[in-house]
C-alpha cells in the first residue's frame, strides 16, 4: 500500500477489511479523506504535529503528538501511510478493551523493550498534561505528572520491581476507572 495516491486495490481493501474493524465502504471513505488531507499518500511527522496543535490550542501538544506519531509509524520510515493510520484508528475506536490496552502499553513503552519504566510513563503523562494545558482541572493527588505516575505505579507495579509489564498494565487498568476512561479519550485524540 505504502504511498499510493490512487484508489485502493481489491487486494488492499480485502487485507484492510480482514485486519481492521471497518467494512469496505468505511475503508474507502477513510482513504478518500486521507488522500484529501495527504495528497502524497503519507503524513509527515511535522504535519501530524500541526494537526494536533489545531485540536489543543490551549496546551502544547507537540511532545504527545511526537510520541503518538512513533506508535503510528510501524515501519519507522518517518511517515504515516494509510494502512498504518487506519489500523490504529480501528484499534482505538473499535478495538476490544484488550487491544486498546495493548495499544496504550505500546505508547508508554518508549524503548519498545516490553516494559514501562517510571521515566517512560512520566514522559508520556507529562506530555499529556502539557497538551491539555488549562483545559482540565486535576485532582489534588494528581496535580503533577509525577504524582499521577506514582499513583499509577503504586496500583500497577504489584511486585515493586520498578517497571510495569503488559500483564500488570492490563490488570491495573481494569481496576482503575480513570485509565479506562483515558483509553476512551484516545478515541477523540486520534
Curated annotation (Swiss-Prot):
A lipid is attached at residue 2 (N-myristoyl glycine). It is found in: Bud membrane. It is a peripheral membrane protein. Pfam families: EF-hand_7 (PF13499), EF-hand_8 (PF13833). It comes from the Eukaryota. Keywords: Calcium, Cell membrane, Lipoprotein, Membrane, Metal-binding, Myristate, Repeat. Belongs to the recoverin family. Binds 3 calcium ions via the second, third and fourth EF-hand. Present with 7160 molecules/cell in log phase SD medium. This is Calcium-binding protein NCS-1.
